[in-house]
């Protein structure tokens, strides 16, 4: 079969696509990966055919993007952010996907490109599968992750999800239909209830909702690349790790574009005074500053290698980082910024493998100091190891997703 795997976003949004595409290719299928250009190096190493979507995700998620800044400051997705992405890219994304899907049997698309992919699938008469890195189906069990809120009463969760879905649907259909008119095509016909959904998260972290009504949902587990057996840490990192007790990892991945980040970083470092720590630079270049001897700056390192070697993990709770943290057996100090991050932070806390999430806008050295003392208690560490063992017993996510896609296509 010829399969298109498509998505857009930060590193945490892109690596699952790479993992799924590589799994499908290993299974003997012809695969085209449609994603941000930042996937180029790893896609090349894995021999994947990458088609680059116009518009760099990294440039969108910076201080130069008013929508991103507003989203991060409010903690909730700003329609201005979606407007920027859609206004700049709709026509180009449809054209890129259309070329990639020539001769394809199925498109597997994640949230930001699922409407564009539906447009192409409709025009070519091919199947579409919706890959979700965070849940969007209505349920009483929890609020919609992209609402940026947690702790809402059950009766409110379904109406809130309906509102978010309806708003997004109206917005995206309008943009897609304008592009289709320009291309001489009829209006988009998309029936969500007919789409097979692959839920790319651990059922230990988030079990199936008790009241989902969608007829075709498969929780596959997270889509992750295998560990790289050839990766070796830089000498300075290896020496730092060997020179004392396990450090506390601090990193916010793709979070960038907020002037307050350096202030929050300083509060965290002050709160960890007297403890060994690793500070990951990330997109915001957080480690580009003078640091105390107890804090070691690092660039990129595989989470599945570094996290198990740490005493705790301070992170933003993106879906990918959340899964890697839970799998590592190391407890977390969640500092969620917005989007779906408060949702995943709340999941870690409710599982007993993280402190109560810290609002970055209220972070102080005292708050961090108390969280570090809490998260390193033996009972929290034991619970983190227990959850890691439960996740390790789950089926492999990309293998399960590959099987589900083939079933969808009648194979």
Model-derived features: positions:
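Residues at the starts of beta-strands that form the adenosine-phosphate
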Residues: 30, 49, 127, 216, ...
């Amino acid at each position: 079969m010829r399969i298109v795997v498509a998505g857009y976003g930060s590193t945490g949004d892109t690596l699952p696509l790479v993992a799924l595409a590589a799994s499908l290719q290993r299974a003997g299928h012809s695969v085209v990966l449609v994603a941000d250009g930042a996937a180029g190096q790893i896609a090349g190493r894995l021999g994947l055919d990458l088609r680059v979507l116009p518009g760099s995700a990294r440039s969108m998620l910076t201080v130069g993007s008013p929508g991103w800044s507003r989203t991060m400051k409010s903690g909730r997705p700003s329609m201005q952010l979606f407007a920027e992405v859609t206004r700049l890219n709709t026509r180009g994304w449809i054209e890129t996907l259309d070329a990639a899907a020539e001769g394809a049997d199925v498109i597997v698309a994640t949230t930001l490109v699922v409407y564009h992919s539906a447009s192409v699938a409709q025009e070519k008469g091919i199947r579409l599968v919706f890959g979700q890195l965070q849940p969007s189906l209505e349920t009483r069990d929890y609020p919609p992750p992209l609402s940026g809120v947690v702790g809402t009463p059950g009766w409110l969760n379904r109406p809130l999800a309906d509102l978010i879905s309806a708003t997004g649907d109206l917005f995206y259909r309008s943009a897609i239909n304008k592009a289709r008119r320009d291309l001489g095509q009829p209006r988009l016909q998309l029936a969500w209830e007919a789409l097979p959904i692959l839920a790319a998260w651990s059922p230990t972290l988030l079990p199936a909702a008790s009241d989902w009504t969608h007829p075709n949902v498969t929780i596959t587990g997270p889509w992750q690349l295998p560990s790289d057996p050839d990766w070796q840490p830089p000498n300075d990192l290896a020496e730092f790790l060997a020179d004392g007790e396990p450090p506390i990892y601090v990193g916010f991945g793709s979070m960038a574009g907020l002037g307050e980040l350096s202030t929050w970083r300083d509060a965290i470092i002050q709160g960890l005074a007297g403890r060994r720590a690793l500070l990951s630079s990330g997109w915001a270049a957080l480690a580009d500053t003078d640091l105390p001897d107890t804090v070691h700056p690092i660039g990129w390192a595989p989470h599945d290698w570094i996290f198990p070697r740490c005493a705790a993990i301070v992170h933003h709770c993106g879906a990918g980082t959340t899964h890697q943290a839970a799998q590592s057996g190391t407890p977390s100090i969640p500092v969620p910024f917005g989007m779906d991050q408060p949702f995943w932070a709340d999941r870690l806390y409710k599982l007993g493998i993280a402190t109560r999430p810290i609002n970055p806008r209220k972070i102080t050295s005292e708050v961090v100091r108390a969280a570090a003392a809490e998260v390193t208690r033996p009972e929290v560490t034991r619970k983190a190891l227990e959850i890691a063992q439960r996740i390790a017993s789950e089926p492999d996510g990309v293998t399960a997703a590959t099987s589900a896609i083939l079933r969808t296509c009648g194979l």
